Amino acid sequence: MLLLCHILAVTILQILIISENWVFAKNINFYNVRPPLDPTPFPNSFKCFTCENAGDNYNCNRWAEDKWCPQDTQYCLTVHHFTSHGRSTSITKKCASKNECHFVGCRHSRDSEHTECRSCCEGMICNVELPTNHTNAVFAVMHAQRTSGSSVSSVPSPYLLVLAWLFMLPLL
């Protein structure tokens, strides 16, 4: 009986892990972008997601041109226009200088009922997300690791670890 409970617990855990992967399989994990292995054009080079007037964040990030930012830029800028219902109307992402990052935050236009939120960040491909309010429309300095030898490990979700522990507890 104990062996049967153990096999059942392991099977349920495997099903949960596999189903989690199926749920997220349709989405690209833009956070898991590794630093490029090709030589950089100059010291402290970086890349940003870049797009001009994209309709949504997914397509902006997915089809972003993969090129190094110019040497006179230090940050990634994101400009997000959206309706009062939160629907994106325009997304622009690009490499930016410090001067272009002075005007971060959100501004609501009463005439057109649209909001524009601007954010800047520092680091390799740091502009994954869209600014949507005053808490994330900020100038964020995040020093990304820029080594080509770094490896990204897959860490299971915390709730799966708790679930596994709960299944194994009766067997102990």
UniProtKB/Swiss-Prot annotation:
Membrane-spanning parts: none
User: InterPro entries recorded for this chain?
Assistant: LYPD6-like, Snake_toxin-like_sf
How is this protein annotated for GO cellular component?
plasma membrane; side of membrane
* Membrane topology reported for the UniProt record: Lipid-anchor; GPI-anchor
Give the positions of lipid attachment, kind GPI-anchor amidated serine: S148
The record's section on Pfam families has: UPAR_LY6_2
Keyword entries, A-Z: Cell membrane, Disulfide bond, Glycoprotein, GPI-anchor, Lipoprotein, Membrane, Signal
Q: Where is this region: Sufficient for inhibiting alpha-7 nAChR currents?
A: 46-140
Q: Organism's domain of life? A: Eukaryota
Q: Give the intrachain disulfide bonds.
A: C48-C76, C51-C60, C69-C95, C101-C120, C106-C117, C121-C126
Propiece residue ranges: 149-172
- Where the record annotates domain UPAR/Ly6, the positions are 46-137
- Primary location class: membrane
The keyword Transport appears for this protein: no
One annotated GO molecular function is: acetylcholine receptor regulator activity
Cleavable signal peptide: 1-25
Compartmental location: Cell membrane
Give the protein's function. Answer: Likely acts as a modulator of nicotinic acetylcholine receptors (nAChRs) activity. In vitro acts on nAChRs in a subtype- and stoichiometry-dependent manner. However, according to another report in vitro it can weakly inhibits alpha-7 nAChRs.
What is this protein identified as?
Ly6/PLAUR domain-containing protein 6B
What organism is the protein native to?
A: Mus musculus
